């Protein structure tokens, strides 16, 4: 271990003595990419990508295990490997609470939220709110807010995290490598649709788990096992504690010593970096937005074959969420033990030399383990793991943002046919890629040591009003559109009142604290999320009680208490849905009408046929399956909205859910 500590201490930013540049590593990486491309091509041949439902919801035919694997892979991006390991290195075990909290919230998705989404017959979350409340403004507001968060938070986190790993492990040019990754991700997102994503997610989940297990084994062996981690972590401190900057000078020991509560999940409600009331309640609110109303996650559930498969997929995802504590957080702590002068650097000029940022280098904890501990071949496997995480997360964002833009914003154009929607959805992915590349300089210039916490705080300032709207929409039938809209607006203004000052003053660091006034910025962001959630919910209910209620005939199968209702529902968006249906030649399916009117027209050439197949847009052409009739579409819709379950399998998934919660409670209690 001493050799690794010395080597780590000597390594600077420009020292790339352990790059992935040998035949074994390159062969593993190439094999991985061939596997992913092969799975994507197979799913392109196997699945229906020529309809909106097929492209965006995988035809709602996925069984439980790809649903669960895709939920996990869509959530676990490279930001988790870099961010969780980095925060674990800096502050100890508590950050694993983010993952173990999700164990319970994902069950809420399967048992409470998904049944209503299914019976509502929707593709996107703003679509659900359009049916539930009517009007356009809530749907449009949420679509724009979600796209904003996708582009400027989720993509930026993945771009930064992937860039950190590539820079540390490869020494490649950041722009060239990330643009190449974005390009490959875009290809199988544009061509394959959601089914291709979910099958490749399944493959990548196994790659992620296998590679992370291998590295964890090497890390624990190097540190002396599980007991070695807990014996040595509290003594993992940098020896370089005097800054060359006279304004900084001798740095306080509180800035470089591990926290006294590093081994505890539940920390002091006032002085803790993750106070236990905030972790249990505030995080549940933010997690509720992400797991129960965020398009990236819910879209995977809506692709399930039936409600039982959706619930089983949520359970599988929950079991997988047990692993980040041991596969990411603890390896990050081990990295601090092995390389304290790098991972735990505190002097601004030292950190600048090691990782290019002055606020700290804890984010290099996981990449440093890969570069220094893994042998040839396995090092390439771990790069493949990081690429898998990055590409999976980005592909999920690309597909889901495409769905949001196409189904919630572009459909405001009343004469948009299905072929046009499919084309626009694919072009939107290309646009997102271009924005991502343009955003790279901003990400690279960001203070990386604070990026992970920054993203969590941004979610806490913007997400609670959305969580409040979805909770009351499902469980309080009396709530109406006016209440929901003004609750969202009031919550947004309240969140911006905290977000803008924090943006302006910066988050600072232990060595150079932020100048933001205490009454604005010193309240923990998860405490703020609790206040924001209840204020938004209260405003929603007050405005709703002061205005006319929505008649019950519009609420059948749109609220939890009426999810099994058999009465016919009069959708508040019925006029919007009926408008394109007549006359069909002009609006509903213009491409089919053209084919019927011009049967004598010559078919497309060979190259055009191949291109149309590659993009999944050859449905209804010669040799392809005929478009479904209106009766077939209605029957399929009734089948997909059915939430009845086989009693035997329903009991099986319920027992598994109880077992998973018992296991989670044991771990919470053990590390509390």
Swiss-Prot record:
List localization entries: Apical cell membrane
How does the record say this protein sits in the membrane?
Answer: Multi-pass membrane protein
Q: Does the keyword Acyltransferase apply?
A: no
GO (cellular component) term, any one: apical plasma membrane
Q: Which cysteines are joined by disulfide bonds?
A: 255-510, 345-351, 355-361, 516-521
Q: What is known about the tissue distribution of this protein?
A: Expressed in the small intestine and kidney.
Q: Name one GO molecular function term.
A: metal ion binding
Chain ranges sitting on the Extracellular side read: 1-22, 86-93, 167-173, 218-275, 332-375, 446-450, 505-522, 671-672
**Chain intervals for the UniProt region annotation (Disordered):** 571-601
Tell me which NCBIfam families the record gives: sss (TIGR00813)
Q: What is this protein identified as?
A: Sodium/glucose cotransporter 2
Q: Which gene encodes it?
A: SLC5A2
